[in-house]
UniProtKB/Swiss-Prot annotation:
Its EC number is 2.1.1.374. GO terms for molecular function: methyltransferase activity. Disruption phenotype: Deletion of the gene has no effect on growth in medium containing salicylate or on intra-macrophage replication. Deletion does not affect sensitivity to plumbagin, menadione, nigericin, PAS or CCCP. This is 2-heptyl-1-hydroxyquinolin-4(1H)-one methyltransferase. SUPFAM superfamilies: S-adenosyl-L-methionine-dependent methyltransferases. Keywords: Cytoplasm, Methyltransferase, S-adenosyl-L-methionine, Transferase. It comes from the Bacteria. CDD domains: AdoMet_MTases. It is found in: Cytoplasm. Belongs to the methyltransferase superfamily. GO terms for cellular component: cytosol. It catalyses: 2-heptyl-1-hydroxy-4(1H)-quinolinone + S-adenosyl-L-methionine = 2-heptyl-1-methoxy-4(1H)-quinolinone + S-adenosyl-L-homocysteine + H(+); 3-bromo-2-heptyl-1-hydroxy-4(1H)-quinolinone + S-adenosyl-L-methionine = 3-bromo-2-heptyl-1-methoxy-4(1H)-quinolinone + S-adenosyl-L-homocysteine + H(+); 3-methyl-1-oxo-2-[3-oxo-3-(pyrrolidin-1-yl)propyl]-1,5-dihydrobenzo[4,5]imidazo[1,2-a]pyridine-4-carbonitrile + S-adenosyl-L-methionine = 3,5-dimethyl-1-oxo-2-[3-oxo-3-(pyrrolidin-1-yl)propyl]-1,5-dihydrobenzo[4,5]imidazo[1,2-a]pyridine-4-carbonitrile + S-adenosyl-L-homocysteine + H(+).
Amino acid sequence: MSTVLTYIRAVDIYEHMTESLDLEFESAYRGESVAFGEGVRPPWSIGEPQPELAALIVQGKFRGDVLDVGCGEAAISLALAERGHTTVGLDLSPAAVELARHEAAKRGLANASFEVADASSFTGYDGRFDTIVDSTLFHSMPVESREGYLQSIVRAAAPGASYFVLVFDRAAIPEGPINAVTEDELRAAVSKYWIIDEIKPARLYARFPAGFAGMPALLDIREEPNGLQSIGGWLLSAHLG
């Protein structure tokens, strides 16, 4: 359920967003978003893992069974499954889960499964996962849901599990509708449950529709190779003691 919603034209996004981000995500995955355009793929669905997380895959940081929480179209789950990991992706959007399942079936990845679930209250995976990855979910949930979310993923984590979070920096996106974080805010929330190894500056990538224009000047947006754009964020690495 990751998002690049605040990249969108400032006026349009506030006029057309519903009161619930969950509904906006669902319409985006169905190709029915007013903000992005009819039939347009969500900008955050770039067809591959976020580059910051792809680098961790290459470095061998992902171990054992992997939980992709807020998986969206599940690019990282699918990439890890192709490397032999058993992956489970959870997302609140039924449309996103259906897209992920379809792609897994297309690639013949029986070791990648997906379920509709609320990240702040899911159960049924106690002590299972060696690695948990949050690819831009953290800023997409209400602040009041963070405690339930962190409790849920700790419950699902195996002893010594690793946890990776890619999240927007509040300095790059100072206003809603999402809940970007400062480094201190991220550290304070996560350190209640995990031993933090590192929080470092990162970039979050998106691909905008052809002809898209008018992004807010205040955002730290960079043009990247292959038609992508990026904005500032944080990459957190942590583990269970």
